[in-house]
């Protein structure tokens, strides 16, 4: 049977596929409108090689731990003010959705 964590990851993949995949790849080094999210959990914001980040994202000083990813997904304009994603994606509606997406992203390594 599936564990609660496996269910959360599966829910996160479904949310990612519907809300994030239009702009973000999950393949290393393959950027779209947004940067690849392969290996994003544990990485510094604005640090994926080969992607032209906004100054706001490059200079944010944020590490993408689960808690910060959820905050960003809940408030794409406010968590890192001035980032480009905030003008394109309003964010997820619940912290549960953000947590599920972060759980899925953590499997991409």
Predicted regions and their residues:
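Short cysteine/histidine-rich zinc-coordinating motifs and their immediately flanking basic loops
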Residues: 32-38
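Detector for the c-type heme attachment site
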Residues: 24-29, 42
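Hydrophobic aliphatic residues
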Residues: 41-45, 73, 105
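Axial heme c-ligation environment in periplasmic c-type cytochrome domains
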Residues: 35, 50-98
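Short, solvent-exposed mixed-charge patches
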Residues: 108-109
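Electrostatic cytochrome c docking/interface patches
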Residues: 1-15
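The canonical Cys-X-X-Cys-His
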Residues: 12, 16-26, 85, 101, ...
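Extracytoplasmic/periplasmic, Sec-exported soluble proteins
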Residues: 4-8, 29, 60-61, 93
């Amino acid at each position: 049977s599936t564990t609660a964590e496996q269910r959360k990851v599966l829910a996160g993949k479904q949310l990612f596929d519907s809300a994030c995949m239009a702009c973000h790849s999950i393949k290393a080094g393959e950027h779209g409108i947004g940067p690849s999210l392969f290996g994003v959990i544990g990485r510094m914001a604005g640090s994926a090689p080969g992607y032209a980040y906004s100054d706001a994202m490059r200079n944010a000083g944020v590490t993408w731990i689960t808690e910060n990813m959820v905050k960003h997904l809940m408030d794409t304009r406010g968590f890192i003010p001035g980032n480009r994603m905030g003008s394109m994606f309003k964010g997820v509606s619940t912290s549960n959705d953000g947590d599920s997406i972060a759980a899925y992203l953590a499997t991409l390594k």
